[in-house]
Amino acid sequence: MTSRLLTDDRLIVGLDLPSMEEARAMVRTLGGTISAYKIGLTLLARPGGVALAHELRDQGKMVFQDWKLHDIGAQVEGAARAVAEGGCDLLTVHAEPQVMRGAVKGRDAGGSSTKILAVTVMTSLSDADLTEIGYGFD
């Protein structure tokens, strides 16, 4: 009997693995039980990382490319357009106005329905980190 959790379309499995081989092995193991995958920066930056995203989409999977883009608006626009043209369902960017505007403009220019997710604060930041970068607490 298959668990409902493993067939729930809301479940996104993170391919936060160190190698393409391990990521592909996980996808093979999970087979048709999972319909959505997140590919993080480590795999996306490896040779074949973006190709893996395309392979998953070709298999009918929903693909979340977790780039967390953060640069000047024009650069984010170009990167978001490239990601959108290549096929992506969800794309992360940092939640700064020029970054988000650039991402939406690039996505739209790419003729895609890619959803843009804005990261407001990295969960890895401690209170001390936030104070150091100017977000002090009273």
Task: Give the predicted meaning of each segment.
Residues 38-41, 52-72:
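Active-site cofactor/substrate anionic-group-binding motifs, chiefly glycine-
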Residues 5-9, 71, 75-138:
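Conserved anion-binding
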Residues 19-21, 42-46, 69-74, 123-126:
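Short, small-residue-enriched loops and turns at beta-alpha junctions
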Residues 24-27, 50-53, 80, 100-104:
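Generic structural signal for well-ordered alpha-helices
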Residues 29-38, 86:
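Catalytic domains of carbohydrate-active enzymes, especially glycoside hydrolases
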